[in-house]
């Protein structure tokens, strides 16, 4: 029962890491990457649909994304969704495909994006600390209900703290890598 708390916390830590990875994938680094478009929803026949379900997305050049809709009639809807997104990239529609040329990042934009990365990383660490608090509360509740001894509680708290430290370290590494990627010219 006691190790179950640590295991559950570690699973939630892993979900936070995956969420952070998805968040970082959406922050463009001056290079074309299909994951930039993961969060774009297209209004398709009245329902919001993820762009990657409506088109194939390829990277023919370092700073170009090519979007080939499966249904050519959806091209205007896809173009509108990209224009309305917060990407800041203008799509070029040639009737059958959409080209997205990723502009080179200015030094100022790079610094702004690096600040954004730090903020997102900090929010992920807050989520980790909340998960730790929940796990610690659960352990204390079990000790209070006499399900575990005080020694078990201390051991459990130590295990939870170690898992938390590992999770925070991983977030710090992910944040540092993304910042480095952004600040590379």
Swiss-Prot record:
Coiled coil: none annotated. Disulfide bonds: none annotated. Its main location: cytoplasm. One of its GO terms (cellular component) is cytoplasm. The lineage of its organism: Bacteria, Bacillati, Bacillota, Bacilli, Lactobacillales. InterPro entries: Ribosome_recyc_fac, Ribosome_recyc_fac_dom, RRF_sf. It comes from the Bacteria. The keyword Magnesium does not apply. This is Ribosome-recycling factor. The keyword Cytoplasm applies. Belongs to the RRF family.
């Amino acid at each position: 029962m006691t190790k179950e708390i640590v295991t559950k916390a570690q699973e939630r830590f892993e979900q936070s890491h995956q969420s952070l990875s998805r968040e970082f994938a959406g922050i463009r680094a001056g290079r074309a990457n299909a994951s930039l478009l993961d969060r774009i929803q297209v209004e398709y026949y009245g329902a919001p649909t993820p762009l990657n379900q409506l088109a194939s997305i390829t990277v023919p050049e370092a700073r170009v994304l090519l979007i080939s809709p499966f249904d050519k009639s959806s091209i205007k809807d896809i173009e509108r969704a990209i224009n309305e997104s917060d990407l800041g990239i203008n799509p070029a529609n040639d009737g059958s495909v959409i080209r997205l040329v990723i502009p080179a990042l200015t030094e100022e934009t790079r610094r702004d994006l690096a600040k954004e990365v730090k903020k997102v990383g900090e929010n992920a660490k807050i989520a980790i600390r909340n998960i730790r608090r929940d796990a610690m509360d659960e352990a204390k509740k079990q000790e209070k209900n006499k399900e575990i001894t005080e020694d078990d509680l201390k051991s459990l708290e130590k295990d939870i703290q170690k898992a938390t430290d590992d999770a925070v370290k991983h977030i710090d590494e992910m944040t540092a890598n993304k910042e480095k990627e952004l600040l590379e010219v």
